[in-house]
Amino acid sequence: MIRLFVGAIGLGVLATSALAADSVEIGIGYLHRAGVKPTLSLVEQPAENDGLAGARLAIEDNNTTGKFLNQHFTLEELRLKDGDDAAKAAAALADRKIGFIIADLPADSLLKAADAVRDRGTVLFNAGAIDDRLREQDCRANVIHAAPTRSMLADGLAQYLVWKQWKRWMLVVGSHEEDKLFAEALRRAASRFGAKIVQERIFEDSGGARRTDSGVTLIQRQMPVFTQQAPAYDVLVAADESEVFAPYLPYRTWDPRPVAGSAGLVPKSWDAAQDQWGAVQMQNRFLKLNSRHMTALDMQAWTAARMIGEAAARTNSANPKSLLDFLKGPDFSVAAFKGQRLTLRDWNLQLRQPILLADGRMVVSVSPQEGFLHQVSELDTLGVDRPETKCKLH
């Protein structure tokens, strides 16, 4: 009896080894730039592995399912230094038979990387760039967008402000290009949902030290003066992606008004305070592995890697074209702890997703808001809809 039992164990080990030997390797690249952008708040400094940590967690999740399907997922990081060419880096990953690349790159670098590997069948997953043009006039057939767009973020915020009847906005815009792009999305959202921008002001970045010993005293004097003599408004909306001034606005405006946009009530794809729809277990797993909270970029990278894992499991394939065809099709969806399964817009390859509205400690609300209807999906009330798109996938 003992001999039979030992023999059975031996056969089991051999069978397991055979399965492992025959498993299909699915390599995923992670392409991003070195360094992190400093923030005004010391408690919000991004980690060196921001985004990458989310992708690593998703690889674990993919392999949990993959072991039953003879699929094994790996992640290969490629960190670009200043001056490194994103196109060459993407090509180098493709040379190593990596068919999927999660990219956290600026818009122009992302396009160069996508074009460099387009004819090789490599699919990029945009985890970081929120530029609408990447899904519109500059869209690519081999780029799937897990990150939301500026217009989706602006629409999610606008829906809540309108639902609250805070329809009169004072818009304060930074002087950098990305600030102007966010302001453009906010103007579009206001017009779309019935809000009115009663006044716009520009906050010029004059340079200088971002933190000084006299900072609190100086800012306490500057911000009330900057925001005084405004027409009647319900909420101050800030467009400051460069993070020059917006964090200084709450509690410092001349009139006692709430702040939203780049500070105060902030639209985002994920927040450390998200605890609904099973998110607590995700937050706890991430915290245990990384000794920090999960950011929006972490979640976007996690979602991108999970999209690959879901498509591989459903098609039982590792072929990039087969997975891309499935992702574009009507049967694809992915769960992401947001109350509903997420699907892909087939006209520009943007992932539909709810937008969280958070104040730094709690998730205040989740858009789309009640009453904002759509004939296909209420998620399509966020961002550019099919009739509006300029995308011609090529």
Language model features with spans:
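Extracytosolic ligand-binding ectodomains
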Residues: 2-8, 19-394
